Amino acid sequence: TEFDTILVVGSTGVDCPLPCQHWVTFHAELFEPWTLKRRENGYPEIPNYWASTYMGGLRRVTRSRIAYDTIFSEGGSSGMIVVQVARERLGAQKIVLAGVPMTIEGGQYDTGRLWAEALAYRDVWERKRDYLKTFVRSLSGWTREQFGEPTLEWLHAEG
């Protein structure tokens, strides 16, 4: 199965060799070093960058030489922001999450450490569960338990 658009979250964009169209994070201050590392890896440039405003304000004062768009966020980690960008700004009808398990043991991609905060970020996902279930599937962890895996039938179904 081919995907129309690929969005990467946070530091995964450094290591993803695919031609991605959008890079999304809570941490816009890291776009510049991440982009340099991606370039050093010889991967294609990513043309669009997104960061969130959290509860109405920028998460941090961020100065970056890389221009990025913003989207309002109620929280839920960078994984939720990527869902919001895909659905609300890009009009995605179906979203497949890869590497967004939202579990303590799933850790964070670039640290290799347990992610104790994972449980705290789930509240937004839980509040939006019924809505998200209509168009989100996941390959791993708690998000897979909540939304199911993407089947070929689901991927190829209309809507």
Task: For the regions a language model picked out, list residue spans one by one.
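Metal-ion/cofactor- or nucleotide/acyl-coenzyme-handling active-site neighborhoods
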Residues: 1-159
